[in-house]
């Protein structure tokens, strides 16, 4: 246990366009090699494209996509008497959002062809509609947790 107490989480300032911390965190995840202006351009273009295609506000699409893509339960390895069990645990809201953003981005990058903003917009639309690679990933994680429900008693110490 640390003796110095806990460190407060740094929350980035909200982004200028949507005034949302969540969007700023997403921009930071999209950013590569410190090129934030390019990441902002990609995210904003993707939001505009998704809003245009679905005829709904961009923030509503993004928040719903994040909510749909985040897992409720996941497995964590726990070593008990020489054997490692995959123990299902509930996912905290911060981690749920972080995983959802990470998976959305990974799925968008895995798509081929087209510019990044189009791939990201397509992935956001898929997550909004509860389809696509991101949702499949979430369902796989939750299925794994469900399969290992027998070991859930190891999660409580």
Swiss-Prot record:
The keyword RNA-binding applies. One of its GO terms (cellular component) is small ribosomal subunit. One of its GO terms (biological process) is translation. CDD domains: uS7_Bacteria. Signal peptide: none annotated. PROSITE patterns: RIBOSOMAL_S7 (PS00052). Keywords: Ribonucleoprotein, Ribosomal protein, RNA-binding, rRNA-binding, tRNA-binding. The keyword rRNA-binding applies. InterPro entries: Ribosomal_uS7 (IPR000235), Ribosomal_uS7_bac/org-type (IPR005717), Ribosomal_uS7_CS (IPR020606), Ribosomal_uS7_dom (IPR023798), Ribosomal_uS7_dom_sf (IPR036823). One of its GO terms (molecular function) is structural constituent of ribosome. It comes from the Bacteria. One of the primary rRNA binding proteins, it binds directly to 16S rRNA where it nucleates assembly of the head domain of the 30S subunit. Is located at the subunit interface close to the decoding center, probably blocks exit of the E-site tRNA. NCBIfam families: rpsG_bact. Belongs to the universal ribosomal protein uS7 family. PANTHER family: RIBOSOMAL PROTEIN S7. Part of the 30S ribosomal subunit. Contacts proteins S9 and S11. This is Small ribosomal subunit protein uS7.
